[in-house]
Amino acid sequence: MSIVLSEHVRQQAARRGISEAIVWAVAEAPEQVVQVRDGREVRQSRVPFPPDGMMYLVRVFVDVSSDLETVVTIYRTSRIEKYWGIA
């Protein structure tokens, strides 16, 4: 399946200091996938961010209800333990 980024996601990523390379990496090869509802999943990975290498959880929300997988929103959080491993 092909993955596409919405313009909204591109704007969010830029505003939140998340490179498109990170968005693509997490969307294509996440450490975890969490089904949040029918047709929507969260793909997430732990990623170090400069300048100090602090570890954040990058959460990529993907609409998987069609032939295209569309990334609809993205954010990063330092509260890894809150979201890591939830099912």
Named regions from a protein language model:
Residues 1-87:
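Ribonuclease/tRNase effector modules and their secretory precursors
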